[in-house]
């Protein structure tokens, strides 16, 4: 594998010195880019795009051709594991992801297979290998998965949800079934992320998109416990260097201390958490990623730069910060505004690393 020309993203995750704060964007390969729209049209639909190695590689690289980003992230979806378990993933126009066969009972959970990443999910590992080759050491490649709790919400609800009544019913009325499902998902995520690492992912991220809908006690029992299990089960060194692990829980700002105890290297912050406060609380244990409100990219270039400056100032001097949005970039953002954001991070952060 090629030596990395730019490793500041990996260095920042390990709180090692960097020249400027590294930056990438969640959903940086996405619908706000006209070139992505063109490639997606070529694929036919989103799932076909994810499963086409050549096109998934193409869209992963598109934002790097536009912006001086410090990392690439595998183009895929968090729901690949439940799809590989046979739940029948499809996308309903205006509705988001749906499953043909949601999970309702103990029998449903017991019959779920743990997918073999090099069989049912080989399109993902093939894409990782292709992207690593195409990157040629330009920047590191991030692999990722949904967290067991977040995957379970989609599997039990049958898709997206606002109230999460079905999964909370399972959690409170049948906790043993809930734990059986989460345990199986944790095993699947470990295999899946380790396969991505073996295929060439240089860092991995676990997205707990719906962790924030739980009480603190339930979060520890039904989400964090399984994230801890995943961190313990991951390959932490490959190709002669550490493979950093980032945990991101949307709405999880109140649990940073508990999340930092998992042994992960970094925590992703959504925009509702104050980064200065987060650094005071856990900055001696983990790096922090984030955390500009993605909607700030609707603002003027001057206002975007001002917000970048405020967040950099909030984090303060030294390494241990990867700049990002607090969640995925919106599909109607002007690509030029994303460029202003990325360049502002590099331009304004150098003074914090002298």
Curated annotation (Swiss-Prot):
Binding-site residues, substrate: 27-31, 46, 77, 154, 209, 327
Highest rank taxon of the organism: Bacteria
Main location: cytoplasm
Subunit field text: Homodimer.
Class of the enzyme per the UniProt entry, highest EC level: lyase
Subcellular localization(s) per the UniProt record: Cytoplasm
EC number of this enzyme: 4.1.1.37
Name under which the protein is recorded: Uroporphyrinogen decarboxylase
Family recorded in the similarity comment: Belongs to the uroporphyrinogen decarboxylase family.
Keywords: Cytoplasm, Decarboxylase, Lyase, Porphyrin biosynthesis
Catalytic activity: uroporphyrinogen III + 4 H(+) = coproporphyrinogen III + 4 CO2
GO BP annotation list: protoporphyrinogen IX biosynthetic process from glutamate
Site (Transition state stabilizer): 77
Gene that encodes it: hemE
Listed NCBIfam families: hemE
Lineage, uppermost ranks: Bacteria, Pseudomonadati, Pseudomonadota, Gammaproteobacteria, Enterobacterales
Keyword Cytoplasm listed: yes
Pathway field: Porphyrin-containing compound metabolism; protoporphyrin-IX biosynthesis; coproporphyrinogen-III from 5-aminolevulinate: step 4/4
Protein task: Catalyzes the decarboxylation of four acetate groups of uroporphyrinogen-III to yield coproporphyrinogen-III.
GO molecular function per UniProt: uroporphyrinogen decarboxylase activity
InterPro entries (alphabetical): UROD/MetE-like_sf, Uroporphyrinogen_deCO2ase_HemE, Uroporphyrinogen_deCOase
Gene Ontology CC entries for this record: cytosol
